[in-house]
Design a protein with these regions (language model features):
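Short, Lys/Arg-enriched C-terminal cap helix and immediately downstream tail that follows
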Residues: 8, 44-45
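Conserved hydrophobic/aromatic packing and binding residues within compact polymer-binding modules
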Residues: 7, 21-22, 32-35, 61
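Short basic helix-loop element that most often maps to the first helix and adjoining turn
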Residues: 5-23
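Short, charged recognition helix plus adjacent turn
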Residues: 63-66
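Absolute protein N-terminus
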Residues: 1-3
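DNA major-groove recognition helix of helix-turn-helix/homeodomain DNA-binding modules
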Residues: 45-60
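Recognition helix of helix-turn-helix/homeodomain-like DNA-binding domains
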Residues: 27-42
């Protein structure tokens, strides 16, 4: 699984739209969309902010990486 797909899975499990997630971590809907489609790569700090907004963290996110 790639970062974008895994983030999208987490976002949908949290019943959030891209817009709602973007507002939570001060990013645009467009940037969230680009990350989920693997067209953009977030910095570690940005990925951490997104994961915190989804109730997760970097350790858990990469723990069970396939």
């Amino acid at each position: 699984m790639d970062i974008g797909s895994k983030l999208k899975e987490l976002r949908t499990k949290n019943n959030l739209t891209q817009t709602e997630l973007g507002k939570r971590c001060d990013l645009t809907k467009g940037f969230i969309s680009q990350i989920e489609r693997n067209l953009a790569s977030p910095s570690i700090a940005t990925l951490n902010d997104i994961l915190n907004s989804l109730g997760s963290n970097l350790k858990v996110f990469f723990e069970d990486w396939e």
